[in-house]
Regions:
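N-terminal glycine-rich FAD/FM-binding segment characteristic of electron-transfer flavoproteins
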Residues: 1-176
Length: 176
């Protein structure tokens, strides 16, 4: 249903490989926002807002949580900054007549909600199974546009606002 699929990643140069994979899976173009150091969810959301202002998407889809820090905050922060509705942890997503119908798993079963577009949707791994990438698609992906910009070029400050005080293992369990 989408007129265009744009894949975006924020990270170091080697994140281009994940974007090339997204292009090989069917994305039309990609943008890498280059940033060598780890960034907090709010920084990512602020960078996405700058891209949203430029691209005007109807739907922004993100994973429900980041793999590097397991935070799960970027989607909610993005929706708040964009002042648009959000649906989280989607395991099924349908678009029709300017509305996104989202089904997600909750403790009591399945919950279905509708949000008006434009919107932000965070998705669960059950949403779909990634496409197998074929060699011809890999070759075509090399010719698709992959723009690279710097986080600073978007006018986003990447200075951390959070400070990790310590990491420690959980207490050992008692035997018996």
């Amino acid at each position: 249903q989408a007129s265009e699929v744009l894949a975006v990643s924020i990270g170091p140069d080697d994140a281009q490989q994940q974007l090339r994979n997204a292009l090989a899976m069917g994305a039309d173009r990609a943008i890498l926002v280059k940033c060598e150091q780890p960034v907090e969810p709010l920084v990512v959301a602020r960078a996405f807002i700058k891209l949203i202002e430029r691209e005007s998407p109807l739907l922004v889809i993100l994973g429900k949580q980041a793999i590097d820090d397991d935070s799960g905050q970027t989607g909610q922060m993005l929706a708040a900054l964009w002042d648009r509705p959000q649906a989280t942890s989607a395991s099924k997503l349908e678009l029709q007549d300017g509305v996104a119908r989202v089904t997600r798993e909750v403790d009591a079963g399945l919950e279905t909600i509708e949000v008006d577009l434009p919107a932000v949707c965070t998705v669960d791994l059950r949403l779909n199974e990634p496409r197998y990438i074929k060699l011809p698609d890999i070759m075509k992906a090399k010719k698709k546009p992959l723009d690279v910009t710097e986080l600073a070029a978007l006018g986003v400050d990447s200075a951390p606002l959070l400070q990790v005080l310590k990491f420690e293992p959980p207490p050992q369990r008692q035997k018996g």
